[in-house]
Amino acid sequence: MSRLIIVFIVVSMICSATALPSKKIIDEDEKDEKRSVAVAGAIIKGAALTFNVLQTVLKALGDISRKIAVGVDNESGKTWTALNTYFRSGTSDIVLPHKVPHGKALLYNGQKDRGPVATGAVGVLAYAMSDGNTLAVLFSVPYDYNWYSNWWNVRIFKGRRRADQRMYEQLYYYLSPFRGDNGWHERHLGYGLKSRGFMNSGGQAILEIHVTKA
């Protein structure tokens, strides 16, 4: 009888030890889900990217006259890895989300420089795609609407390229950007991909882009 009791105790201890890692994995998954909220710098499910989510990101920036919330949905079948952000005007306190798997969307923001300065929020995001090429996203929210308008663009560059002044000029001046006109625009990007995006026309802007298989 005593041997049976000992065997029972040993088996119970083994089962308990086996259950602990599983619980830890579940806890980590729950933490990841909690991190996937509507804040700049987060990665969320692609299907969850909506105007309401971007408005939440925008609101978190506070009372700033020139600001933007950016959401880019990855339905490309590829994984994206952040390279950098180049700001032509303005800034952001957010680190560009590092990894964006297929089926997920990144959230980011930008704003005018702090203080009484006449600047907008203008920049380019660059992501290395798992096929070896670079996805680039332009956003432009100007300070002076007497002379300028909102503009955006999304393009794929061959090979690996970091965002810089030259990339900004290509996207803004030469590669047919879209005006932020409160409407949706579509474009074939090449490499078997296409895009669909929306940007509003105001100084507190949202930019929603979906990159999908063509």
Swiss-Prot record:
Residues 46-65 are annotated as: N-terminal region. GO terms for biological process: cytolysis in another organism; monoatomic cation transport; pore complex assembly. A motif (Cell attachment site, crucial for protein stability) lies at residues 179-181. Residues 140-155 are annotated as: Trp-rich region, which is important for the binding to lipid membrane. GO terms for cellular component: extracellular region; nematocyst; other organism cell membrane; pore complex. It comes from the Eukaryota. It is found in: Secreted; Nematocyst; Target cell membrane. Belongs to the actinoporin family. Sea anemone subfamily. Phosphocholine binds at residues 89, 122, 140, 142, 168, 172-173. Keywords: Cleavage on pair of basic residues, Cytolysis, Ion transport, Membrane, Nematocyst, Secreted, Signal, Target cell membrane, Target membrane, Toxin, Transmembrane, Transport. Pfam families: Anemone_cytotox (PF06369). Residues 20-35 form a propeptide. Octamer or nonamer in membranes. Monomer in the soluble state. Residues 38-47 are annotated as: Plays an important role in the hemolytic activity. It comes from Actinia equina. This is DELTA-actitoxin-Aeq1c. The record marks 179, 195 as: Interacts with the lipid membrane. The record marks 147-148 as: Important in the initial contact with the lipid membrane. GO terms for molecular function: channel activity; toxin activity. Pore-forming protein that forms cations-selective hydrophilic pores of around 1 nm and causes cytolysis. Pore formation is a multi-step process that involves specific recognition of membrane sphingomyelin (but neither cholesterol nor phosphatidylcholine) using aromatic rich region and adjacent phosphocholine (POC) binding site, firm binding to the membrane (mainly driven by hydrophobic interactions) accompanied by the transfer of the N-terminal region to the lipid-water interface and finally pore formation after oligomerization of monomers. InterPro entries: Actinoporin_PFT (IPR050677), Anemon_actinoporin-like (IPR009104), Cytolysin/lectin (IPR015926). Composed of a long N-terminal alpha-helix and a core region rich in beta-sheet structures. Before the pore formation, the alpha-helix binds the lipid membrane, partitions into the lipid-water interface and stabilizes the monomeric molecule on the membrane. Finally, it traverses the bilayer, thus forming the transmembrane pore. Residues 1-19 form the signal peptide.
